Amino acid sequence: RGLGDVYKRQVKSMLDFDYIGVHPTGVVLVDQDRTGHKIHGVPVVSNLANVAEYVCREWFDEVLIVLPEDREIPQKVFDAFTEMGITIHVKIADVNEMQGKNQTVERMGNYTVITTCINMASAGQLILKRIMDICGGLVGCILTGIIFLFVAPAIYIKSPGPIFFSQYRVGKNGRKFKIYKFRSMYMDAEERKKELMKQNRVSDGLMFKMENDPRVIGSEKGPGKGIGNFIRKTSLDEFPQFFNVLKGDMSLIGTRPPTVDEWEKYELHHRARLAIKPGLTGMWQVSGRSEIMDFEEVVKLDTKYISEWSFMLDIKILFKTVLIVLGQKGSM
């Protein structure tokens, strides 16, 4: 028999993969004695019965064992490699290359598993991000208190009622939480939203954006007028969310949390943007903010942020956000 395609494919996989400092120097076939033949230039050096003796006499640093699911390496061969102090790698699964995904091998109970996720952040990185959130949340809550002294009377005079607006949003991996804002709309805003859906600039209903929203406090004075438009344009309405950041519902940087009704319309790939905690600001906000009307573009930017996340990327987005807010360009 000739050498099977399976063996050729496995050897080629080793040669093609960019192993640092590792070079295949020999192959052993478990069901054939083809000593002396070559597969893609790599010699078949022994059969299974004599492989331990061969490895003992030759120069080998490591052994990679790749077997089909219905075959097991004889325990005496495995024990022989261990006794010789050889580093052994055993294939536990065939994993297809997944673009933009990260994989690692972990222990879960008695199982050795391959973990695949959109971002493989370390515990240290997550702790650093949380420390930044706590520090930012504390400062933000203090600023929120100061802003409250000026904004609260202006809101109440124009629209008597609660100063704060709260609403359930969908956070990391589908967890629901209550988000807080300074109220920039009249009390019946949620009821009127259904009437205004035809004017939604995002056609699929996965976000709600419209020009000159009549629900905004003071909007009857004209486009961009009134206290409601002012606090939205300057993003002052978002400051109470620093309390959400401090609680741990949100992060300073992340993806914007959808409303429950928006989330219920999500397709499978949309859920990827919920793989991390939602944030006060994020990549799509600093890449166009309210000017982006294509939800698929939002999802693309959000998943790009998640897969490429680093602490320095958060710092860059944070500084860009400050510059954009100071320039009053759009709303968060």
Regions of interest found by a model, annotated:
Residues 12, 46, 53, 83, ...:
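Generic recognition of well-ordered alpha-helical segments
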Residues 85-87, 91-94, 237-245, 286-292:
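Hydrophobic alpha-helical segments characteristic of transmembrane helices
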Residues 124-192, 244, 311, 316-332:
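A hydrophobic, helix-centered structural microdomain
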